Amino acid sequence: KINLENLFSVTLRDAGEVALIDGACKKIVASSKTGHAVHISRMSASGRYLFVIGRDAKIDMIDLWMEKPAVVAEIKVGLEARSVETSKYKGFEDKYAVAGTYWPPQFVIMKGDSLEPLKIVATRGMTVDTQEYHPEPRVAAIVANHHKPEFVVNVKETGKVLMANCSFLNNLKVTEIAT
């Protein structure tokens, strides 16, 4: 049995895989084929799922509760990406996953247990400094708020941080913060 409290996710970049390493014995206990050049691995709030996203914008969802952890869902959310995150707020644990892409300039809100897309939000807009239109702002870091059902989305070239409140997804409230 895998000790999930002492498990590490390591990107095997050139192989296009993620290895799961037991922290006690330092051995690979499972590995999964993933997208190209995995950029980040994120654990779900429950600890059941590990989400990885490659620079090719492919997300793989690995179920760690299986006897041998394996990819149970995957989706390609764009052409280039860097970040994925899952909801952490009490009552919303594992409900949503959010991925941001460099191209097209957007973030995608998905079901956290299946990666089914629910909403796509474009990030094109004006820069905070010169108020010029930027057609290709890249979404960089995405972080889940532990105190509200929202995600903090960093939109690079615009100089904005977006606070996407997922309380009512059909009426998504996005607050812009100039940085």
Regions of interest found by a model, annotated:
Residues 1-179:
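Predominantly soluble domains enriched in secretory-pathway, periplasmic, or organellar proteins
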